[in-house]
Structures are given as structure tokens and as C-alpha cells.
């Protein structure tokens, strides 16, 4: 748990203490920025290189993952998720399990959906929406990454809607 610093943030859900699960669920930027400050840019850059995260380019800001120099494609996201799922990075298995638990969204029948949305905002407009994750069932694991970009109204929630509709049409999610 990381205690809230009593700064007023733009979303009520951010204005409290958070665990990994609650911070993932509410996309609490200050939670992850606090962890990043403890790690430092050198360690973060090293981790990004270790997992081959997109172009591995981070600036010195504390929001390098939001509309900055760090870029990744949907194909790279799927590759990263697959490696994360199989823990080919050789991270502590307990840490991998904790992250998997924190992105578990719903179990429906024999399917469990894991995922994370993200929204990039520039000048007050949602211009970049992501939904990445995977679906587990008794036969297979299906990985996905959806990225939408527009001058406005491109959000993670819209990317999630599109993804789930496609997965339902394909018979993977119902």
C-alpha cells in the first residue's frame, strides 16, 4: 500500500491510499509515479531494455509512459504480454502473479479476461486509447492489443468496447 499524499487529484478515486490492485483498477498515475521515483530513471530504463519495451525511449519526466517519447506498437504489446505471461523475463514469480491478479477483470463461464486500458490525453483531448490483455480458457490463452488514435474521443474504454465486440464475434469471449 502506498499512502495518499493529500494532494487533490483530478479523480476522486485517486484521492486515497492505494494498493497495486486498486491503482491498476483506477489508473492512479501518482501511485506508479511514486514507485518510479523510488526506482529512478536508470533502473526504469534498464527494465524497459530488459523486456524490449517498444522503442525503450524515456524522457526525464515522471509521466514518460503518457504521450511522450516512449512508443510501442500493438504487435509489440502482444509480444510483451506473451513474454510477461510466460515470465520469460525471469522476474520474481510472485511479482508476476501479483500483476496478473491486478489486471484480472472478469470471469465469465470458463473464460477469464485480463486487461488494462490506457488513455493518452493531449491538450484536454483523448487522442490515444489502448486496451491490452488476454483471455484464458481451458483450451487456450488469447492475447490482444487494441490501439485507437484520433483527434478526440480515443480512449481506453472505447478501445475495450471495440476489442470485446471483436472477441465476441470471433467466438473467443461471450
Predicted regions and their residues:
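A generic structural signal for nonpolar/aromatic side chains embedded in well-ordered alpha-helices
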Residues: 23-24, 48, 99, 103
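Active-site SXXK
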Residues: 1-2, 23, 144
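Generic preference for hydrophobic/aromatic residues in regular secondary structure cores
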Residues: 2, 56-60, 105, 109-113
Amino acid at each position: 500500500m502506498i499512502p495518499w499524499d493529500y494532494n487533490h487529484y483530478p479523480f476522486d478515486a485517486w484521492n486515497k491510499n492505494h494498493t497495486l490492485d486498486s491503482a491498476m483498477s483506477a489508473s492512479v498515475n501518482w501511485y506508479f509515479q511514486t514507485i518510479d521515483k523510488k526506482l529512478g530513471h536508470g533502473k526504469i530504463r534498464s527494465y524497459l531494455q530488459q523486456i524490449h519495451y517498444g522503442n525503450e525511449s524515456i524522457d526525464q519526466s515522471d509521466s514518460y509512459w503518457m504521450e511522450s517519447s516512449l512508443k510501442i506498437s500493438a504487435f509489440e504489446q502482444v509480444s510483451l504480454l506473451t513474454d510477461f505471461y510466460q515470465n520469460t523475463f525471469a522476474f520474481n514469480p510472485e511479482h508476476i502473479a501479483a500483476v496478473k491478479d491486478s489486471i484480472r477483470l472478469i470471469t465469465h463461464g470458463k473464460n477469464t479476461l485480463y486487461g488494462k486500458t490506457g488513455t493518452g490525453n493531449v491538450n484536454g483531448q483523448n487522442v490515444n486509447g489502448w486496451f491490452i490483455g488476454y483471455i484464458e480458457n481451458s483450451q487456450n490463452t488469447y492475447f490482444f492489443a487494441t490501439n485507437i488514435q484520433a483527434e478526440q474521443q480515443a480512449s481506453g474504454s472505447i478501445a475495450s468496447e471495440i476489442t470485446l465486440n471483436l472477441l465476441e464475434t470471433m467466438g473467443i469471449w461471450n
